[in-house]
């Protein structure tokens, strides 16, 4: 089926905000006014369409970015029909990965702010992510009906905290209980919404007397911002000529898409005021897929390639999310950047080097689905039947291969052991964890070789809590989780010369005889090394690998606390054998005994993992952050300004053992405004007090 809406009338947008700024309610109202939802779902009732996982409805926070779409002809029905694809994004810091991956496939974003709370910590994180992917944005100041609502304070905070350049295109008429509508600064008219029709009906009226001076002041600021779009407009403006409505909107649009300004609007989604005008602003100011730079990638020989948002180009798309659906199995959400694809077509995944047949194509309206036959450049849809694709993979035309830039996902920072409450659930738990890890690239699962336990790792304590919860709800597996754990290692500081291991059993019948002499020495950063220095055949050739094997067996459990041994060099220097009683097993035992003894003599020490920690914090909390890192045995390595203003970055090296509970602590230290990332750096010697505690705990 040919494209129904021309691509210049597409808008792919994300609605992004801090928790409780009213983002989900705003999306619900959009779906209502665009005629999709006839009864508005309120988050208070746990009935919102976009929040479709059970935990989201219980907790009232959005965890997975559901993708949905709607059609819009303008508030007054005066626009040609536009197609708006909306990705709802979470606002909690442990789900930053979800925001990051949706930013990657958006063309524009609508930032929702609470008129009372204003620019919150999470808003700063989301803003940085939008900057990273150069996403043009508009701002919607929501909850104007709340006590303490202040539109102009949010405008100041956007300048000061986010270093943004907000340009109000509306100002509120009244606030708190008296919030009635907005002044449209382009038309210089007030808009008031009718309560009885849930805001569907509205009218333009003259600006109330008491607001005229304020409206004129902000209108002039807006026109000045528009005039800076190009020389011709600036000359016209400076020459005292009035700019037309079309010129103002066109100029603001160009500057928004260039990332120079952020048009600001206001309203109350809950009270059904202002959402339709915000939709008009999405059409007026945010880009269509052809207004943004073409997507970059590279070919199979690493040559740079690009694809334009055009149906005639070869098909290319990015898989940005995987979800498991109870009815159809795995859904892969993808964004089409160029070309078209039909259900039943074969697509190529250059990352996995596999061809796959595209089964059904579904378009989602929250969690209801409509099956469609084809998708085109600019579309967002979900595919059924792709077995190999994972988040961040490219899908493309098999004859025109392109690999789009991959998404980067942070390494998990916290691990916990998890075991099923009943033994019978072991297999089910394995399946559930693998399915969850496929959906969420920031969640990892592995089996600990030392303890045999299943270890899960993720981005924070809430992240793991929600995944364990999902395992219970979606897969029916009840699990218990252990305390967060640290992976220590053991090594040595000194050389132990000529240490012998003798394994002799000679009491009737076939005996055992193995005798090996080794020298053990530190081998920093090089792992385990075995050197054969046997001369004159004192140990026969065929038994030497057995000595090495015996030592390797012992490496897994050190002498201090049973942790793996790293960075040691063993030289096999001497030994003896018996013609009849010597065999592989005897030399394996001799090697193991010699190594254990040598370890004890070589001054063994405990190593702990050190993490590179980066904290982004507003300047006023920097002292607290540095003091706290020092109290965690951290070494601060330097600080720098965040580019574009907005605080400082502190670089430090901190032992992993001291970082548990850090996200909660950091939130309270900085009133939730600082964020951090950490990744493994290297192993370092643990201080004596730490070693003693770990060893005695292990021996107990």
Curated annotation (Swiss-Prot):
Catalyzes the GTP-dependent ribosomal translocation step during translation elongation. During this step, the ribosome changes from the pre-translocational (PRE) to the post-translocational (POST) state as the newly formed A-site-bound peptidyl-tRNA and P-site-bound deacylated tRNA move to the P and E sites, respectively. Catalyzes the coordinated movement of the two tRNA molecules, the mRNA and conformational changes in the ribosome. Its main location: cytoplasm. It is found in: Cytoplasm. PROSITE patterns: G_TR_1, G_TR_2. Belongs to the TRAFAC class translation factor GTPase superfamily. Classic translation factor GTPase family. EF-G/EF-2 subfamily. This is Elongation factor G 2. It comes from Ralstonia nicotianae (strain ATCC BAA-1114 / GMI1000). Keywords: Cytoplasm, Elongation factor, GTP-binding, Nucleotide-binding, Plasmid, Protein biosynthesis. One of its GO terms (biological process) is ribosome disassembly. Coiled coil: none annotated. GO terms for cellular component: cytoplasm. The gene is fusB. InterPro entries: EFG_II, EFG_III, EFG_III/V, EFG_IV, EFG_V, EFG_V-like, EFTu-like_2, G_TR_CS. It comes from the Bacteria. Pfam families: EFG_C (PF00679), EFG_III (PF14492), EFG_IV (PF03764), GTP_EFTU (PF00009), GTP_EFTU_D2 (PF03144). GTP binds at residues 17-24, 88-92, 142-145. One of its GO terms (molecular function) is guanosine tetraphosphate binding. Residues 8-290 form the tr-type G domain.
